[in-house]
């Protein structure tokens, strides 16, 4: 590959690139370096360029995680029962972030495209507050009123999980998350379930 050998002078930049069998010098007024992060060393993104730039007098912000999953302290039941289960067609909201997509519940927490998209604001909140509390709409194509009306129907002898599946189509990991985060006394209240 190509590696930077030297850089910098007060009248612009002189950069030397060394490639197999040749060397090239480039004079530039400005240089944009696309060097990758520090999380995939086996693919070349090892972050070693940070120290090189600092030694050359360039101010470099610390590398921070991005496009990453997050740890969640699940109950043993959720961790064992729903590890690897996808949450599809959900809307994740956090501050000004609001996006529909999908992600996966893992034993350690959450990961997947929707989580990666929200990773920067979630990371910043965790750095500032020690935690991030997000909102998840598991039925984004249904109105609050429709959900309340359907969930208010008598469930008879059916379990609450069966009632949720029959009336509004919630099942599996989505019901597992409701059990995980809703107080038991509110789990049978249609208005709270629809919120």
What kind of feature is each model-predicted range?
Residues 1, 12-14, 23, 87-91, ...:
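Short, acidic/polar N-cap/turn motifs at the starts of alpha helices
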Residues 71-102:
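Acidic, Ser/Thr/Pro-rich intrinsically disordered regulatory segments
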Residues 30-76:
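Glycine-rich loop(s) and the adjacent beta-strand/alpha-helix scaffold that form part
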Residues 16, 30-34, 40, 91-195:
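Residue-level recognition of phosphate/Mg2+-coordinating polar/acidic sites
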Residues 45-52, 78, 86-88, 100, ...:
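Internal, well-ordered alpha-helical segments in soluble enzyme and binding-protein domains
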Residues 5, 70-72, 109, 123:
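Short secondary-structure boundary/hinge segments and terminal tails
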Residues 2-26, 31:
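Conserved beta-strand-loop-beta-strand element in the redox core of flavoprotein oxidoreductases
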